[in-house]
């Protein structure tokens, strides 16, 4: 690399001096004890810089306290200020950079310092610096785990990756199946925290958006384009963004995979699939205490923003067209982000341009100090990107000086969605109890005589009918309430732990591991997406975390696990749109979108991260510790057996599922009958769009109901199998439970088959009707064919008879001529042809005459067109001949004029020329003394030559004109001959038509 200029070295020295000043900041313990003033909204009040890790607010909590460990001490004094957590992650050199001779320009000097290889005095200190061999799981534990924990406690959090293009931002945030990124690890950790907090209920919602060319698009709803950013007292928000309530990690990861399908990516010189937009994945967390005794307590509300920024691009990218436009918008938003961070840290009360870009406007509340912020800067050590890496490090150094204050958000009123769901569930349960306990009392029957027995009997029958209808209505209302309670209860997640245990132990222990199941890994890309354009792979060896195995065992395990994942991924993709599986076998109605696969040979991967379990059975056995529906979770051997209360809840849950299954089956049968009726109406009026729309709507409803039925069918056996101990207490043997399950399945299959049979029967009736109609049509066609064949036979017979009659007539005439004696027998007449034969013959002749007439008309039309064309040609030729004659006349006049001029010029010139020549021959001395006559002679000679040339040109033109005149005359003669031929043909045609008419008259009319 070339030597730095002097000015650049001075700037580097000043930066190093700044680092030295930063290193002399107080220690972490001193910072935590120091009570800093709360900054005003929008600008910081302190310019103190620090490079220590931001304080993790994890108080020492009691194990036997009545409150949850996550939410103990919420009403204490406000927490002290923190600095933004800034970490730096290096990616390894790619094979292409190694082949090109790239050198390491920046390196990690320890765990907290980044130093320049060219100028060791230039260094920057951060909370943590990760070497190229560091795994994403280690990055998450340091840079993101405390932010996720705070978000589950009610503190807003923001985690975003910043860096140039192809530095590994998307790999760090999203990862792949071998190394899940920050976003999958955060989602998994959030559900693990729910499992470890048994005395609180949680409601999780997610949204996923992108900022592409300064336009906000909803990735979960492709129709949500160009959304607007609004503001309210709680901060900025996107109007019209779609939020999905998530029930499991696989559910959330499937939404991320579906959103990634709609994200804008493109190819550049550095990346085969480069992110062309910023994405923000938001996890909204609401929680409240469990039980009705804590009904009046506030609901905690927080948002966790996981941001994947697009990489800044330099001029070396050499982009054009759309890519250049995208790069300009990306650089503009990142430049605005840098400006905002600079103004936040300079300590001056100046205007902060949050509104200059959509990205900074959405990050306004996070950067203004409301919540915890973690910045992960991804850099490349290559010398070709040394300047870009230096800019990223300076940006991270400025961001480290931002101060934030983590405070818990509480919602006292009824605006919380979880509070709304809880109140509605409570109200529906009360209504259900009223329906169960309600007793319909009739009017007491008074003593009546024998005369009124019939009247009272009739009234009693009427009352029974009314009571029966009322009972049916109440049963329907009960079923609807059960379905509503089940649907709402599924959305609220609670832990399976029956006892209160603390997440945080006073003594340090092993960190919680994040074991992903196969159904969760299926929604992550198999290979990292941000591929550097290369034909080689760069897989570095990473240490095995928590597993004491040798290098050969680790390689063999990764090889086997890769084969299992490939088999599972292929099976998923063959299915197309697969069904999402939750932790207890529930099927979500979301369609899985598989992220685009990338070539294996063109990737530069971070080190692979081995998981704890290495077999498909082990993964499925320890997939999730939470479940869906009625707040119940799968039984875990680590946390003991379920309590009797939980068992009773599970029994009620199974009953609810069965009731809902019956309701859905009835609804499917009802919708099927409605669809049948609409189909009949559509057959009668196929152009009615309203009926078509109703049919489509009913079909969609039937599909949704069938999908729900399939989901319930899978939930019921799973719930029964997870509670075999409870079944033993209730004297239900496994065989009886299996028989009951099979009975339910068979009954449902029978209902479905009955509905299918009805549909098939209707289709069969329609096909039978169509077959009968086709048979009638075939019989009719056969009859017509038979009649046609008979007519053809009669026609051929009549023709043969006519020919025979003609031959006999000629023979008789010949015989009469030879004998020349007429044989007339008085009183006898010659035999006549049958009248039918004559009629057929006349019809045939009429058809022939019609054909002849049509041919003649066609021929006349053609001749008329040809004659018209010939007349046009003749008139055009006459006009052209006239024009040519006029032109010839003009040229002849001009030729005569030129000839006269030439004659006048030629007459004196030869004499003067001859005399001059003789004079020059006689005496050369006399020519020297007479220059004027010689000049005149030369001028005359030149004039004569010019006139001769003009004359030759005129003669050539005259010859050309003469040739054209001859051609015109020939063309005129040809056209005249053609015209004459045409008239002859017309006359012949008229004559032939006259003869034909005469023949027709003589042949038919005369006879």
From Swiss-Prot:
Segments of skewed composition (Basic and acidic residues): 920-941
List the cofactors.
Answer: Mg(2+)
What GO MF annotations does this protein's record show? Answer: ADP binding; ATP binding; ATP hydrolysis activity; magnesium ion binding; microtubule binding; microtubule motor activity; protein homodimerization activity
List localization entries: Plastid, Chloroplast
Low complexity bias (residue ranges): 1-55
Q: Binding residues for ATP, per the UniProt record?
A: 163-170
Q: Gene3D superfamilies of this UniProt entry?
A: Kinesin motor domain (3.40.850.10)
User: What are the cysteine partners in each disulfide bond?
Assistant: none
Q: Per UniProt, which keywords does this protein have?
A: ATP-binding, Chloroplast, Coiled coil, Microtubule, Motor protein, Nucleotide-binding, Plastid, Transit peptide
Tell me, what does this protein do in biology?
Answer: Probable minus end-directed motor protein with a microtubule-enhanced ATPase activity. Binds ATP/ADP in vitro. Retains total enzymatic activity even after the removal of the ADP bound in the active site.
Q: How does it assemble?
A: Binds microtubules. Homodimer.
Family note: Belongs to the TRAFAC class myosin-kinesin ATPase superfamily. Kinesin family. KIN-7 subfamily.
The molecule here is called Kinesin-like protein KIN-7D, chloroplastic
Classification from the root reads:
Eukaryota, Viridiplantae, Streptophyta, Embryophyta, Tracheophyta
Point out the gene that encodes the protein: KIN7D
């Amino acid at each position: 690399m070339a030597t730095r200029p002097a000015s650049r070295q001075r700037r580097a020295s000043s930066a190093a001096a700044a680092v030295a000043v930063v290193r002399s900041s107080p220690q972490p313990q001193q910072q935590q004890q120091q009570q800093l003033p709360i900054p005003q909204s929008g600008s910081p009040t302190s310019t103190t810089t620090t490079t220590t890790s931001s304080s993790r607010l994890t108080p020492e909590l009691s194990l036997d306290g009545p409150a949850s460990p996550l939410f103990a001490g919420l009403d204490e004094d406000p927490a002290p200020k923190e600095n933004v957590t800034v970490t730096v992650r290096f990616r390894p050199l790619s094979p292409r950079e190694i082949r090109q001779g790239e050198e390491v320009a920046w390196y990690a000097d320890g765990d907290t310092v980044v130093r320049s290889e060219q100028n060791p005095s230039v260094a920057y200190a951060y909370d943590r610096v990760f070497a190229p061999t560091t795994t994403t799981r280690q990055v998450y534990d340091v840079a993101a785990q405390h932010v996720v924990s705070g978000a589950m406690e009610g503190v807003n959090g923001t985690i975003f990756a910043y860096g140039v293009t192809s530095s590994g931002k998307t790999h760090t945030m999203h990862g792949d199946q071998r190394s899940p990124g920050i976003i999958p690890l955060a989602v998994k950790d959030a559900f693990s925290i729910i499992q470890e907090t048994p005395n609180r209920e949680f409601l999780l919602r997610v949204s996923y958006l992108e900022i592409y060319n300064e336009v906000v698009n909803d990735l979960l709803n492709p129709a949500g384009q160009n959304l607007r950013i609004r503001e309210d007292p709680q901060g900025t928000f996107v109007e019209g963004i779609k939020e999905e309530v998530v029930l499991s990690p696989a559910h959330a990861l499937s939404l991320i995979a579906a959103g990634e399908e709609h994200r804008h990516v493109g190819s550049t010189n550095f990346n085969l699939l480069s992110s062309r937009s910023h994405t923000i994945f938001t996890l909204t967390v609401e929680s409240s205490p469990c039980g009705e005794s804590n009904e009046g307590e506030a609901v905690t509300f927080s948002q966790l923003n996981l941001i994947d920024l697009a990489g800044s691009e330099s001029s070396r990218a050499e982009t054009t067209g759309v890519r250049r436009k995208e790069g300009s918008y990306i650089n503009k938003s990142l430049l605005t982000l840098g400006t905002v961070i600079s103004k936040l840290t300079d300590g001056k009360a100046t205007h902060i341009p949050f509104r200059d870009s959509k990205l900074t406007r959405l990050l306004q509340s996070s950067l203004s100090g409301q919540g915890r912020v973690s910045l992960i800067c991804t850099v490349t050590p290559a010398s070709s990107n040394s300047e870009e890496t230096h800019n990223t490090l300076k940006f991270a150094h400025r961001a480290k000086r931002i101060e934030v204050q983590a405070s818990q958000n509480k919602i006292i009123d009824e605006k919380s969605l979880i509070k709304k769901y809880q109140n509605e569930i409570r109200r529906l349960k009360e209504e259900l109890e009223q329906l169960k306990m309600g007793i319909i009392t009739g009017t007491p029957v008074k003593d009546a005589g024998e005369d009124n027995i019939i009247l009272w009997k009739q009234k009693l029958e009427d009352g029974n009918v009314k009571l029966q209808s009322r009972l049916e209505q109440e049963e329907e209302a009960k079923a609807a309430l059960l379905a509503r309670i089940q649907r709402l209860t599924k959305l609220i997640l609670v832990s399976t732990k029956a006892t209160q245990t603390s997440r945080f132990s006073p003594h340090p222990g092993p960190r919680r591991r994040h074991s992903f199941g196969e159904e969760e890994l299926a929604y992550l890309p198999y290979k990292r997406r941000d591929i550097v354009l290369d034909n080689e792979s760069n897989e570095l060896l990473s240490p095995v975390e928590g597993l004491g195995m040798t290098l050969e065992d680790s390689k063999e395990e990764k090889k086997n696990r890769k084969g299992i994942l490939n088999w599972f991924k292929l099976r998923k993709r063959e299915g197309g749109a697969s069904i999402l599986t939750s932790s207890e076998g529930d099927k979500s109605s979301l369609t899985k979108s598989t992220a685009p696969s990338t070539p294996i040979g063109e990737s530069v991967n971070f080190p692979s991260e081995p998981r704890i379990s290495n077999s498909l059975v082990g993964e499925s056995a320890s997939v999730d510790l939470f479940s869906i529906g009625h707040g119940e979770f799968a039984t875990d051997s680590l946390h003991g057996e379920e309590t009797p209360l939980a068992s009773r809840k599970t029994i009620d849950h199974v009953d609810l599922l069965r009731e809902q299954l019956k309701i859905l089956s009835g609804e499917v049968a009802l919708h099927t009958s409605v669809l049948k009726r609409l189909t009949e109406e559509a057959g009668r009026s196929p152009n009615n769009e309203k009926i078509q729309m109703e049919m489509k709507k009913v079909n969609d409803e039937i599909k949704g109901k069938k999908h729900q039925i399939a989901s319930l069918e899978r939930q019921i056996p799973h719930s029964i199998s997870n509670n075999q101990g409870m079944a033993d207490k209730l004297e239900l043997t496994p065989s009886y439970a299996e028989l009951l399950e099979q009975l339910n399945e068979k009954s449902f299959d029978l209902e479905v088959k009955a509905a299918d049979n009805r549909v098939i029967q209707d289709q069969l009736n329609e096909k039978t009707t169509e077959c009968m109609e086709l048979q009638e049509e075939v019989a009719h066609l056969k009859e017509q064919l038979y009649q046609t064949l008979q007519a053809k036979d009669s026609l051929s017979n009549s023709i043969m008879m006519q020919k025979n009659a003609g031959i006999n007539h000629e023979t008789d005439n010949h015989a009469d001529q030879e004998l020349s004696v007429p044989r007339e027998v008085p009183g006898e007449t010659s035999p006549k042809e049958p009248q039918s034969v004559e009629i057929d013959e006349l019809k045939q002749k009429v058809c022939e005459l019609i054909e002849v007439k049509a041919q003649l008309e066609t021929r006349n039309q053609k001749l008329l067109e040809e004659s018209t064309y010939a007349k046009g040609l003749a008139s055009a030729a006459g006009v052209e001949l006239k024009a040519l004659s006029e032109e010839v006349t003009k040229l002849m006049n001009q030729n005569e004029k030129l000839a006269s001029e030439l004659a006048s010029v030629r007459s004196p010139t030869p004499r003067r020329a001859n005399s001059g020549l003789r004079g020059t021959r006689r005496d050369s001395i006399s020519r020297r003394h007479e220059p004027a006559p010689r000049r005149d002679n030369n001028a005359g000679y030149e004039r004569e030559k010019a006139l001769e040339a003009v004359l030759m040109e005129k003669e050539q033109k005259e010859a050309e004109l003469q040739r054209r005149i001859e051609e015109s005359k020939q063309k005129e003669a040809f056209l005249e001959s053609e015209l004459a031929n045409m008239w002859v043909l017309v006359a012949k045609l008229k004559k032939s038509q006259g003869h034909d008419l005469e023949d027709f008259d003589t042949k038919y009319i005369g006879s």
